[in-house]
């Protein structure tokens, strides 16, 4: 079967934004205008097609990323609509990993908001080219200029308008295209019928000034535009578009368009900008991978061996587990065998599905640049590389996800529900790399851990709805960490003689702090003092002990362990003995190096009317908060950014609502770990019945 759309005509894009900026509404309009859907569904009344989960419809927010495909001006646009709430930022992270471009949606009144910063930073990490859509231009306080300024100052983004709005707030009626110097007025009907009009006299001078700024901004990316600009010659539209595209593909220039998706103004022009300026798979650098521990580059071509990255798992009630994947090279047909190089396992693709939110269409094959879902992959999880069965066994760069910072205990309301609870948690954990579930070894309780209270609320709600499990939920708990603050050499020796074969393991390990670098194990054994086959076992023994901690039962982080000496017994030494010896050494380290408790510190952004400034700041201070930034928005609202321990943030939503008469909002996400004050740490250790 030949390719229906050339690879140069593909656009793999994500729609990303702060919560309530109008991201899903914008996506719905894109689908309507491209003919993908024939009736517009609204987020606020639960009618959005992209928000298909019951929880999304009830709460009016996006929780999980949803994929679909649309067509516009001869281009195939694969779209992923991502959540705007910080608790579900993993959905943005894994989507951006497999996308070539993105549309950042801003609220024209608020400009850049806290979660905008987070998703923008994620896109920058993956070098994803972006355009900016300033939405809600009809809203009170809407200001295109201030929104662009917020991108420049808060995101350090080189944002440049390619449109000038005509009117704002209730007077917003359309825009001037600064590239073609044409004015468009909209009737506000669902079809978004735009009428080209002569540029109104009152906007002509401003449009000429803004076009000059645009030309100046792109000239540094295109020599021909620069020469024509210096000679004060007219720049052809096609050349200017080409220069804007070239600049955008560098991820150092961000074209800005405007509109109001809900009122059906400006969305078609935004889709045009996606087609004109965002990259095809041929425009982005080759993907980095590894083959036999050497770096290789995977280029986008159907002629190359098949390679793809699994970026999402979803449990479908009708077809079972779906594995979403992005094809980076080659062709794959349904029924084929593939090789999971991450897990070193062969698997068979059953069916291949083209997804539209939660509906699906079966297809025969996928090619380079496609995003699809597979049925039948049992061992493949998020971040795994799959290649053709006979292909070179490369491994694409892995995804890295944040660790959970909050946990709760669950208890099924009946013993009969225990098995269903276990199955449900297993399936939900397979879907979400930032969700963990485990059994507390001391209490026997089932523990769930995630990125925030809303994250865990949704997990519990899904257990009830999708798996029919009623559970009792404990109070949220903070996920503390442990680490050491000094360097020491420690001996671990395990000898057991009780008849029959004995046990012998003996190690000397240097433990030292390893700030912000996780766990590092170094083997410095020389002369065969410990046989090579036991080295990995010693490392595993340390990792297992780190998971349960040595101070208060919390996982250890940022530790370097150097194995430098030890001994073995030709008869009695075993893997188990060395694992125990390593664990004993780490346990003994508590007595010779200072072990401390670390608490998660959250980045908290609060937006509220300025008359409540004193109350809000005073409350944050009482919560051990440290003010990082303080500003006043263009609409007069106060915005405070602070670092606050997670343990102090429980119940904050209720307190903020009370302080600001319901007019304050906040967002928070994990920022870093910090040493817990001694008096608080002692109390935590005491509660867990573990002596310091």
From Swiss-Prot:
Binding site for GTP: 17-24, 81-85, 135-138
Coiled coil spans: none
GO biological process, one term: ribosome disassembly
Localization annotation: Cytoplasm
Record-linked Pfam families: EFG_C, EFG_III, EFG_IV, GTP_EFTU, GTP_EFTU_D2
Gene Ontology CC, one term: cytoplasm
Domain called tr-type G: residue spans: 8-282
MF terms in GO: GTP binding; GTPase activity; translation elongation factor activity
Disulfide bonding pattern of the chain: none
Alphabetized UniProt keyword annotations: Cytoplasm, Elongation factor, GTP-binding, Nucleotide-binding, Protein biosynthesis
InterPro entries: EFG_II, EFG_III, EFG_III/V, EFG_IV, EFG_V, EFG_V-like, EFTu-like_2, G_TR_CS
PANTHER family from the UniProt entry: RIBOSOME-RELEASING FACTOR 2, MITOCHONDRIAL, TRANSLATION ELONGATION FACTOR G-RELATED
Function: Catalyzes the GTP-dependent ribosomal translocation step during translation elongation. During this step, the ribosome changes from the pre-translocational (PRE) to the post-translocational (POST) state as the newly formed A-site-bound peptidyl-tRNA and P-site-bound deacylated tRNA move to the P and E sites, respectively. Catalyzes the coordinated movement of the two tRNA molecules, the mRNA and conformational changes in the ribosome.
Protein family according to the UniProt entry: Belongs to the TRAFAC class translation factor GTPase superfamily. Classic translation factor GTPase family. EF-G/EF-2 subfamily.
Protein name per Swiss-Prot or TrEMBL: Elongation factor G
Protein species of origin: Mycoplasmopsis pulmonis (strain UAB CTIP) (Mycoplasma pulmonis)
Upper classification of the organism: Bacteria, Bacillati, Mycoplasmatota, Mycoplasmoidales, Metamycoplasmataceae
Gene name for this UniProt entry: fusA
């Amino acid at each position: 079967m030949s390719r229906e759309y050339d690879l140069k005509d593909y656009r793999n894009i994500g729609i990303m934004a702060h919560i309530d900026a109008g991201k899903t509404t914008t996506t719905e309009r894109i689908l309507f205008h491209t003919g993908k859907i024939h009736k517009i569904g609204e987020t606020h009344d639960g009618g959005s097609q992209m928000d298909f989960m019951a929880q999304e419809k009830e709460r009016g927010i996006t929780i999980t990323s949803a994929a679909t495909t649309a067509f516009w001006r001869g281009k195939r646009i694969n779209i992923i609509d991502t959540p705007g709430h910080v608790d579900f930022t993993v959905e943005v992270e894994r989507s951006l990993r497999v996308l070539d471009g993105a549309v950042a949606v801003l609220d024209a009144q608020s400009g850049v908001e806290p979660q905008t910063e987070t998703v923008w930073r994620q896109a920058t990490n993956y070098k994803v080219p972006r355009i900016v859509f300033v939405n809600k231009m009809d809203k009170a306080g809407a200001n295109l200029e201030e929104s662009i300024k917020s991108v420049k100052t808060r995101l350090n983004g080189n944002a440049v308008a390619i449109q000038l709005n005509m009117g704002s707030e209730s007077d917003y009626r359309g825009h001037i295209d600064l590239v073609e110097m044409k004015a468009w007025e909209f009737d506000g009907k669902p079809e978004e019928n735009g009428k080209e009009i002569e540029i109104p006299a009152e906007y002509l001078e401003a449009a000429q000034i803004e076009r000059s700024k645009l030309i100046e901004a792109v000239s540094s990316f295109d020599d021909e535009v620069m020469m024509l600009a210096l000679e004060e010659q007219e720049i052809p539209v096609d050349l200017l578009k080409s220069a804007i595209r070239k600049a955008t593909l560098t991820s150092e220039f961000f074209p800005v368009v405007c509109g109001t998706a809900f009122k059906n103004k400006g969305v078609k022009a935004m889709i045009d900008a996606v087609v004109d300026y965002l990259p095809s798979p041929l425009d982005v650098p080759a993907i980095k991978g590894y083959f036999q521990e050497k770096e290789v580059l995977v280029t986008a071509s159907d002629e190359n061996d098949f390679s793809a990255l699994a970026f999402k798992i979803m449990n479908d009630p009708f077809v079972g587990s779906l594995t979403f994947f992005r094809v980076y090279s080659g062709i794959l047909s349904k029924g084929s065998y593939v090789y999971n190089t991450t897990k070193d396992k062969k698997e068979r693709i059953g069916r291949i599905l083209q997804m539209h939110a939660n509906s699906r269409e079966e297809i025969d094959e996928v090619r380079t640049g496609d995003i699809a879902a597979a049925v039948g992959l049992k061992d493949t999880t998020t971040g795994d590389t799959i290649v053709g069965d006979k292909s070179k066994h490369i491994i694409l760069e892995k995804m890295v996800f944040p660790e959970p910072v909050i946990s709760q205990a669950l208890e099924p309301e009946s013993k009969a529900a225990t098995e269903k609870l276990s199955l449900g948690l297993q399936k939900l954990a397979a879907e979400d790399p930032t969700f963990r579930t485990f059994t507390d070894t001391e209490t026997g309780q089932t523990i769930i851990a995630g990125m925030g209270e809303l994250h865990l609320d949704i997990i519990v709600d899904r257990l009830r709805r999708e798996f029919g499990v009623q559970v009792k939920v404990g109070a949220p708990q903070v996920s503390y960490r442990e680490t050491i603050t000094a360097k020491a050499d420690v001996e671990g020796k395990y000898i057991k003689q009780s008849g029959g074969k004995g046990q012998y393991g003996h190690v000397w390990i240097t433990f030292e702090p390893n700030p912000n670098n996780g766990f590092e194990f170094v083997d410095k054994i020389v002369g065969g003092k410990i046989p090579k086959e036991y080295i990995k076992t010693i490392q595993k023994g340390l990792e297992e002990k780190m998971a349960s901690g040595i101070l208060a039962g919390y996982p250890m982080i940022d530790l370097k362990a150097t194995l430098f000496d030890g001994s073995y017994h030709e008869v009695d030494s075993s893997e188990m003995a060395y694992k125990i010896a390593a664990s004993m050494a780490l346990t003994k380290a508590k007595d010779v190096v200072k072990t401390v408790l670390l608490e998660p510190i959250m980045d908290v952004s609060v937006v509220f009317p300025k008359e409540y400034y004193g109350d809000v700041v005073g409350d944050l201070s009482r919560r051990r908060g440290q003010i990082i930034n303080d500003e006043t928005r263009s609409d007069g609202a106060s915005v405070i950014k602070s670092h606050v321990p997670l343990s102090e943030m429980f119940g904050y939503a209720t307190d903020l609502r009370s302080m600001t008469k319901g007019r304050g909002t906040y967002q928070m996400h994990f920022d870093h770990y910090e040493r817990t004050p001694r008096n608080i740490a002692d109390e935590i250790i005491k509660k867990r019945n573990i002596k310091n």
